[in-house]
Curated annotation (Swiss-Prot):
This protein's name: CBL-interacting serine/threonine-protein kinase 23
Protein modification: Autophosphorylated.
Catalytic residue positions: D154 (proton acceptor)
Gene that this polypeptide is encoded by: CIPK23
Domain Protein kinase residues, every copy: 31-286
Organism: Arabidopsis thaliana (Mouse-ear cress)
Transmembrane regions listed in the UniProt entry: none
Major localisation: membrane
Entry's Gene Ontology molecular function annotations: ATP binding; potassium channel activity; protein serine kinase activity; protein serine/threonine kinase activity
Keyword Ribosomal protein included in the entry's annotation: no
One GO biological process term: signal transduction
Length: 482
């Protein structure tokens, strides 16, 4: 049965606090927070805009209490220091760190090209030259970070983003590894990452070299890019681990002989005999068409590293999160947010049309009222076996049954994009991606009386002006500029 965690949406809204933005938006320092881009048990990533200069960023919001509870202060300071010093063109940049009394905010580079994951499906493998280009950028970025003592430990296509020019950007470098510890033997001992991409020595949990484990994951990614499917796959976790331990996989016939040879040397189950990053970089297959990265020099300040745990109130990095409670209406998307979700202005849409992708989020538009949309979603999801929690115009749908990758969890939010038009964004926050799309298809079928257009229908209308959202964005820009 659907349950709600906050008062009814008819509750009168409070007056907007001084310094907060209108329409229920949250303001943190000089940044106005927008929609949620991704979330996990440890943090949420929000789209944000610098109100002083208009720059767009992504802000990772971490619960300070969890950091303190897990005695991770020294570790998080070390990770932040390293991340701020990393200035590689293929790694997401960290610009600054802020903190409130309850949260830590990482201000990160925002890229608009989508995930590399979105370019891959069972029928959408990349050509070898294109796969090699991304692999070269990946190896360069990971090797650079290793040279500065930072290991990823959860490399997978979902953590590899693309900028507007199609260049690779590795995300969550170092930060994804915060809960892990190095013991006295100098080896990592925490099993982490996505099982299909994890090295056998990590699964063994006997201690492992972070660089060798990351290289294994890079090898799996290369295989996926070229094959369109995973080298190690099994619905039974024990059977999957056995395949990984023995490196039981077969390269498809379209792999070149030199690519097969390199992948087999990377996916060596014995870390002692596995090829190294230095050897990969000197490999003839790898060097074909290689372009060295171009670095930018910039001054870096580490003053904010200690300041984020300074609660004296004297630190300039201590910010106050201001927001409006009890919204009467959904948040209204501004012009840039419309553009950033627009199919016509997002490079990822070009790949979607060609690849038949499996994405972790989707959306539809509706001309029904916001309250009716929320009520109908609650009514449609409950019979499908989902617990529904509603907080104003944000919803969390959690499956009662456990699927292939645990319980399916779907974060949903209703945005107003025009006086009588709303956009409903649904994002997988837990569970299996394919199960998410099956759920979404069944849900929207049950919502056909309120769904105006789905994302697929928008694409069918073409990318000129970005379809519904692109046209809406253009009209919004024109209105704001007058």
């Amino acid at each position: 049965m659907a349950s709600r965690t906050t008062p009814s949406r008819s509750t009168p809204s409070r007056s907007t606090p001084s310094g907060s933005s209108s329409g229920g938006r949250t303001r943190v320092g000089k940044y106005e927070l927008g929609r949620t881009l991704g979330e996990g048990t440890f943090a949420k990533v929000k789209f944000a805009r610098n109100v002083e200069n208009g720059d767009n960023v992504a802000i990772k919001v971490i619960d300070k209490e969890k950091v303190l509870k897990n005695k991770m202060i020294a570790q998080i300071k070390r990770e932040i220091s390293t991340m701020k010093l990393i200035k590689h063109p293929n790694v997401i940049r960290m610009f600054e760190v802020m903190a409130s009394k309850t949260k830590i905010y990482f201000v990160l580079e925002f890229v608009t090209g989508g995930e590399l994951f979105d370019k891959i499906s069972s029928n959408g493998r990349l050509k070898e030259d294109e796969a090699r280009k991304y692999f070269q950028q990946l190896i360069n970025a990971v090797d650079y970070c290793h040279s500065r003592g930072v290991y990823h430990r959860d490399l997978k296509p979902e953590n590899l983003l693309l900028d507007a020019n199609g260049a690779l950007k590795v995300s969550d470098f170092g930060l994804s590894a915060l809960p892990q510890q190095v013991r006295e033997d100098g080896l990592l001992h925490t099993t982490c990452g996505t099982p299909n991409y994890v090295a056998p020595e990590v699964i063994n949990n006997k201690g492992y070299d972070g660089a060798k484990a990351d290289l294994w994951s890079c090898g799996v990614i290369l295989f996926v890019l070229m094959a369109g499917y995973l080298p190690f796959e099994d619905s039974n976790l024990t059977s999957l681990y056995k395949k990984i331990f023995k490196a039981e996989f077969t390269c498809p016939p379209w792999f070149s002989a030199s690519a097969k040879k390199l992948i087999k040397r990377i996916l060596d189950p014995n870390p002692a005999t596995r090829i190294t990053f230095a050897e990969v970089i000197e490999n003839e297959w790898f060097k074909k068409g290689y372009k060295a990265p171009k670095f930018e020099n910039a001054d870096v300040s580490l003053d904010d590293v200690d300041a984020i745990f300074d609660d004296s109130g004297e630190s300039k990095n201590l910010v106050v999160e201001r927001r409006e409670e009890g919204l009467k209406t959904p948040v209204t998307m501004n012009a840039f947010e419309l553009i950033s979700t627009s199919q016509g202005l997002n490079l990822g849409s070009l790949f979607e049309k060609q690849m038949g992708l499996v994405k972790r989020k989707t959306r539809f538009t509706s001309k029904s009222s916001a309250n009716e949309i929320v009520t109908k979603i609650e009514a449609a999801a409950a019979p499908m076996g989902f617990d529904v929690k509603t907080n104003n115009y944000k919803m969390k749908l959690t499956g009662e049954k456990s699927g292939r990758k645990g319980q399916l969890a779907v974060a949903t939010e209703v945005f107003q994009v025009a006086p009588s038009l709303y956009m409903v964004e649904m994002r997988k926050s837990g569970g299996d991606t394919l199960e998410f799309h099956k759920f979404y298809k069944n849900l929207t079928t049950g919502l056909k009386d309120i769904v105006w257009k789905t994302i697929d229908e928008e694409k069918e209308e073409g990318t000129d002006g970005g379809g519904t959202n692109g046209a809406m964005a253009n009209r919004t820009i024109a209105k704001q500029s007058t």
